[in-house]
Amino acid sequence: MSDNTTLAPPAASQAPATPRKGPPKFKQRQTRQFKSKPPKKGVKGFGDDIPGMEGLGTDITVICPWEAFSHLELHELAQFGII
C-alpha cells in the first residue's frame, strides 16, 4: 500500500445538506380569548320573585365579591380571572 492513499475526514467548514432549525418559537397572546362569555354578577333567582321583597328591586349592594358570584363554582371563577 502506498502512503498517498490516506483517508481524510470531511472538512469541518462544510454545512450539512439540510440546515438544522431550532425549536419553533411561539408568540404569547396579549389577550385571552374565551369561547364562552364570562359570568355576570348577581345571584340567580334573587329579585322581585320573592314574596315581600317586591319594592327592593335587584340592585343589591354586595359587600363581599364572593356574594355576587355565589351561584358559580370556584373553577368557573378562576377560568375568567375573578379569583
Swiss-Prot record:
Record keyword Chaperone present: no
Keyword Nucleotide-binding: no
Listed Low complexity bias regions: 1-19
A GO BP entry: visual perception
Region of interest (Disordered), residue spans: 1-51
One example GO MF annotation: cGMP binding
CC per GO annotation: photoreceptor outer segment membrane
Catalytic activity: 3',5'-cyclic GMP + H2O = GMP + H(+)
Name of the top EC class for this enzyme: hydrolase
Enzyme nomenclature, EC number: 3.1.4.35
Biased composition (Basic residues): 22-43
InterPro entries cross-referenced by the UniProt entry: PDE6_gamma (IPR006952), PDE6_gamma_sf (IPR037030)
Alphabetical keyword list: cGMP, Hydrolase, Sensory transduction, Vision
Free-text comment about domains: The C-terminal region is important in conferring inhibition.
PANTHER family assigned to the protein according to its UniProt record, in alphabetical order: RETINAL CONE RHODOPSIN-SENSITIVE CGMP 3',5'-CYCLIC PHOSPHODIESTERASE GAMMA-SUBUNIT-RELATED, RETINAL CONE RHODOPSIN-SENSITIVE CGMP 3',5'-CYCLIC PHOSPHODIESTERASE SUBUNIT GAMMA
Subunit structure as annotated in this protein's UniProt entry: Tetramer composed of two catalytic chains (alpha and beta), and two inhibitory chains (gamma).
Protein family (similarity comment): Belongs to the rod/cone cGMP-PDE gamma subunit family.
Purpose of the protein: Participates in processes of transmission and amplification of the visual signal. cGMP-PDEs are the effector molecules in G-protein-mediated phototransduction in vertebrate rods and cones.
Name of the protein in question: Retinal cone rhodopsin-sensitive cGMP 3',5'-cyclic phosphodiesterase subunit gamma
Organism: Ictidomys tridecemlineatus (Thirteen-lined ground squirrel)
